């Protein structure tokens, strides 16, 4: 709903008909037909050091499994009575952000749309333009309002200069 630019994919598109030569087969941890499915520890992950830098209050922390294999995005999801983590053999730090087609875990249709640019990017560009244009406090305010609303309610910019802000 906030996309400015994207590629809308349907099951009959060539990119889907090829099977695994597409976005979901590379990045979706929950597809039944992809580079990540069935390959021991073949899932896309975040580095543990980077994961540890994400504040607990930031929704982006839930885009990856925690060290104890938890993510609010999939904690209650199951296939045939088995947890998603167990069913797919997921391990800590695995990406949970990109869902399966039609939110059906384990399906083999890789027809997920591809977001290329979202409206949110314009807010970030505006914040940076304010800061780089000599209004650091305005840029920080724009950024803080955006991040607090959409990502992390406790976020505060620590930038002391326009260069720090970048």
Regions found by a protein language model. Name each.
Residues 46-47:
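Periplasmic/extracellular electron-transfer cofactor-ligation site
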Residues 10-43:
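His/Glu-based metal-binding/catalytic segments typifying zinc-dependent metallopeptidases
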Residues 1-21, 51-166:
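Acidic/polar-rich alpha-helix caps and helix-coil junctions
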């Amino acid at each position: 709903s906030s996309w400015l630019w994207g590629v809308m994919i349907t099951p009959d598109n060539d990119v889907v008909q090829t099977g695994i030569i597409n976005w979901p087969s590379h990045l979706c941890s929950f597809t039944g037909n992809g580079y990540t499915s069935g390959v021991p520890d073949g899932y896309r992950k975040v580095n543990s050091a980077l994961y540890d830098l994400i504040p607990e209050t930031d929704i982006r922390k839930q885009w990856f499994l925690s060290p104890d294999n938890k993510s609010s995005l999939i904690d209650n999801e199951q296939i045939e009575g088995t947890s998603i983590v167990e069913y797919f053999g997921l391990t800590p730090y695995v990406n949970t952000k990109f869902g399966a087609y039609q939110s059906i875990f384990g399906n083999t249709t890789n027809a997920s749309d591809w977001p290329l640019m979202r409206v949110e990017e314009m807010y970030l560009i505006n914040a940076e333009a304010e800061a780089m244009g000599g209004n650091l406090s305005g840029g920080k305010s724009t950024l803080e309002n955006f991040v607090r609303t959409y990502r992390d309610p406790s976020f505060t910019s620590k930038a002391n200069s326009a260069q720090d802000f970048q």
